[in-house]
Amino acid sequence: MVGGGTVKKDLKKAIQYYVKACELNEMFGCLSLVSNSQINKQKLFQYLSKACELNSGNGCRFLGDFYENGKYVKKDLRKAAQYYSKACGLNDQDGCLILGYKQYAGKGVVKNEKQAVKTFEKACRLGSEDACGILNNY
């Protein structure tokens, strides 16, 4: 920093900047709000929805988790699978891994082992060690 000064930590101000960034369609601003316990859960869902709309694989995967676990929304395995699918399409390795599990087990999607293998292959290419391990044992 110029002059050697420091900025005092101010979580409230940081949240304001993240919210503003999210409102200005900056997906990282939206995602930065995820781990903050001071955020209203309904608002958090809105910020994640916006991140997903802005093509954040992480945002879509988090929404999938919410629907799968009934966290802040009514549990809906089909919607969860749709969000995991979008996350995978955006090259989110964990989204692909989870979608592969869903396809293999037929949870929220039609059971399709061939498609599950393809999805695990993509997750493995994206760096998922778990997916690579599944393929090695298949």
Curated annotation (Swiss-Prot):
<keyword id="KW-0378">Hydrolase</keyword>
<feature type="disulfide bond">
    <location>
        <begin position="22"/>
        <end position="30"/>
    </location>
</feature>
<feature type="repeat" description="TPR 3">
    <location>
        <begin position="97"/>
        <end position="130"/>
    </location>
</feature>
<feature type="disulfide bond">
    <location>
        <begin position="124"/>
        <end position="132"/>
    </location>
</feature>
<feature type="disulfide bond">
    <location>
        <begin position="52"/>
        <end position="60"/>
    </location>
</feature>
<dbReference type="InterPro" id="IPR040239">
    <property type="entry name" value="HcpB-like"/>
</dbReference>
<keyword id="KW-0046">Antibiotic resistance</keyword>
<feature type="disulfide bond">
    <location>
        <begin position="88"/>
        <end position="96"/>
    </location>
</feature>
<dbReference type="Pfam" id="PF08238">
    <property type="entry name" value="Sel1"/>
</dbReference>
<keyword id="KW-0802">TPR repeat</keyword>
<keyword id="KW-0677">Repeat</keyword>
<comment type="similarity">
    <text>Belongs to the hcp beta-lactamase family.</text>
</comment>
<dbReference type="InterPro" id="IPR006597">
    <property type="entry name" value="Sel1-like"/>
</dbReference>
<keyword id="KW-1015">Disulfide bond</keyword>
<dbReference type="InterPro" id="IPR011990">
    <property type="entry name" value="TPR-like_helical_dom_sf"/>
</dbReference>
<comment type="function">
    <text>Hydrolyzes 6-aminopenicillinic acid and 7-aminocephalosporanic acid (ACA) derivatives.</text>
</comment>
<protein>
    <recommendedName>
        <fullName>Beta-lactamase HcpB</fullName>
        <ecNumber>3.5.2.6</ecNumber>
    </recommendedName>
</protein>
<feature type="repeat" description="TPR 2">
    <location>
        <begin position="57"/>
        <end position="94"/>
    </location>
</feature>
<dbReference type="GO" id="GO:0008800">
    <property type="term" value="F:beta-lactamase activity"/>
</dbReference>
<dbReference type="GO" id="GO:0046677">
    <property type="term" value="P:response to antibiotic"/>
</dbReference>
<feature type="repeat" description="TPR 1">
    <location>
        <begin position="1"/>
        <end position="28"/>
    </location>
</feature>
